[in-house]
């Protein structure tokens, strides 16, 4: 207030740049009643009819993709079995909407028992925040490198979408160990169903700092529309083909 008053005495206009979190709180609008200024925080859009529309879109799209991609699933399964020992699929506990645990499925892209070796390479982590990422992860198999380059290892998550555990578009499902390190505001990203792809995945993928990923997730939640989901899915295609930021 003192700064504003000083500007007024100097006949200068006062302007300021809010924090990034203030900017993405796009549900905030200003109004006034009988001259009294009010700030309104609008409800998140993903409930009721909108939630029904999103789930319907997920169910239809995942059903079609399962049928259309079945031949590709078979080819990938054979490739994995020929390349290294272990199962075709890899399942991992993740945290979904509301903090609920579920099993996420992927095509196996690492050697069998890779999770047990994570402590040996923990000091090589290249990501900030609670996420663990290494560009040249020694646990990745030959076939796994190809699958990860084009995000083909993520395809079994379509079954997670079909069963209602995930959505086609939404925040990335975190590991339980990641959630333990969350700050309070990070939990906002788990107010909706987690997804296969999302806003930050088409805005830089693994190259983005952790907090920027979270901010993009929150922006998505607060500005959701079915058209936004479709746009993100369409933008995911060239991002996957270019393999930009994938590792």
Predicted regions located by residue number:
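Alpha-helical membrane and juxtamembrane elements of multi-pass inner-membrane transport
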Residues: 1, 47-54, 137-144, 176, ...
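N-terminal hydrophobic signal-anchor/signal peptide
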Residues: 1-70
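Short, glycine-rich, amphipathic interfacial segments at transmembrane boundaries or analogous
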Residues: 18-22, 28-31, 89-138, 197-215
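Short Asp/Glu-rich motifs
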Residues: 26-27, 114, 178, 185
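A hydrophobic, helix-centered structural microdomain
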Residues: 50-117, 146, 160, 226, ...
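A short, structured surface patch at a secondary-structure boundary
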Residues: 130-193, 232-240
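Acyl-group handling in specialized metabolite and lipid biosynthesis
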Residues: 218-221
């Amino acid at each position: 207030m003192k700064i504003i008053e000083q500007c007024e005495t100097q006949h200068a206009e006062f302007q300021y740049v809010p924090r990034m979190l203030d900017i993405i709180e796009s549900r905030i609008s200003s109004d006034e009643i009988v001259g009294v200024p009010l700030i309104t925080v609008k409800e998140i859009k993903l409930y009721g009819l909108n939630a029904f529309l999103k789930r319907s879109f997920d169910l239809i799209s995942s059903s079609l993709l399962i049928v259309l991609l079945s031949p590709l699933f078979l080819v990938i399964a054979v490739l994995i079995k020929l390349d290294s020992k272990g199962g075709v699929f890899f399942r991992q506990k993740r945290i979904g909407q509301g903090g609920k645990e579920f099993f996420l499925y992927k095509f196996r892209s690492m050697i069998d028992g890779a999770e047990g070796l994570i402590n040996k390479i923990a000091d090589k982590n290249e990501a900030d925040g609670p996420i663990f990422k290494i560009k040249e992860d020694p646990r990745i198999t030959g076939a796994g490198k190809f699958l990860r380059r084009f995000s083909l290892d993520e395809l079994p998550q379509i079954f997670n979408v079909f069963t209602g555990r995930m959505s086609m578009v939404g925040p990335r499902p975190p590991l339980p160990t990641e959630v333990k390190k969350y700050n309070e505001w990070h939990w906002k990203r788990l107010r909706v169903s987690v997804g296969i792809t999302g806003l930050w995945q088409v805005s830089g993928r693994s190259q983005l700092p952790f907090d920027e990923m979270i901010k993009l997730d929150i922006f998505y939640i607060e500005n959701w529309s079915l058209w936004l989901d479709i746009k993100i899915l369409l933008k995911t295609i060239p991002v996957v083909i270019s393999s930009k930021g994938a590792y």
